[in-house]
Design a protein with these regions (language model features):
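N-terminal assembly/interaction segments in proteins that build large macromolecular machines
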Residues: 1-162
Length: 162
């Protein structure tokens, strides 16, 4: 497989994305149209809120699905809905969740009338070659770090008491 890995830094420098998109030939990988497409998808991943976690439904883990179904089921039961309706509510909620967490299901930021999948399909038709989004990772500065909670007054008092 040919293609490129795009490293995109969103303006302001707080968000970055690594994205791999494959094509069939190195000729296509070198074209401006393909490179622009890859950059646009990287920009989408950087700007999308909620941020995509998976490429498509097939990549969603069973653990994630079960957890989300349990949450949706508990919420539906808490409202007093009958059991027959609860499962339909859970199914609808899961479809909504897929639109949030699956990149190809999301509305494309640069043209919200299209999903990312529809935009990908239009680019495949235009370029005339199979393209596939292989993997991506979004990085947000400071994400996952625990912020220290210092109390300056207590710190000064502790030092004065020594």
């Amino acid at each position: 497989a040919e293609g490129i890995v795009e490293a995109y830094i969103h303006p302001g420098g707080r968000v970055g994305v690594l994205l791999e998109v494959n094509c069939e030939t190195d000729f296509v990988a070198k074209t401006e149209g393909f490179q622009r497409f890859v950059k646009e998808i990287a920009m989408h991943v950087a700007a999308a809120d909620p941020a995509p976690r998976f490429i498509d439904k097939g990549e969603v883990t069973q653990e994630f699905i079960e957890k989300e179904k349990d949450i949706a089921r508990a919420q539906a039961i808490a409202t007093g809905k009958p059991e027959a309706i609860v499962e339909k509510i859970v199914e609808g909620k899961m479809n909504s969740i897929y639109k949030d967490v699956c990149l190809l299901e999301q509305p494309f930021i640069m043209n919200p009338d299209l999903t990312v999948q529809q935009y990908l399909s239009s680019r495949i038709a235009e370029i005339g070659e199979k393209l596939s989004i292989r993997r991506f990772q979004k990085y947000v500065m400071g994400e996952g770090l625990e912020k220290r909670k210092d109390n300056f007054a207590e710190e000064v008092a502790a030092q004065m008491g020594q």
